[in-house]
């Protein structure tokens, strides 16, 4: 399953998207995310299953680019 990972460096800062990881379940995503994004001493890190993200703007499906008329 694909997870989107968000983190912050200091308490009180906003969470920022730091990337994504593939993990078989919620338990292992914690270890995978910590290992993958270990370049900072994060105050907080959260992982959200990509399928659980709610579309706020835009289309659900990516649109095809316009075709050339030439």
Feature map (PLM): residue ranges:
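Short aromatic-glycine-(Arg/Gly/Cys) micro-motifs in beta-strand/loop hairpins
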Residues: 1-16
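Residues in well-ordered beta-strands of folded domains
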Residues: 6, 22, 48
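Compositionally biased, intrinsically disordered low-complexity segments
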Residues: 12, 21, 57-59
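Short acidic, gly/pro-rich beta-turn/loop elements at beta-sheet edges
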Residues: 15, 31, 55-57
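A short, exposed loop/beta-hairpin motif centered on an aromatic-Gly-Thr core
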Residues: 16-24
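Short, charged/polar surface micro-motifs in flexible loops or helix N-caps
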Residues: 26-27, 53
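Short amphipathic, charge-patterned alpha-helical segments
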Residues: 28-35
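Short, mixed-charge low-complexity intrinsically disordered segments
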Residues: 35-70
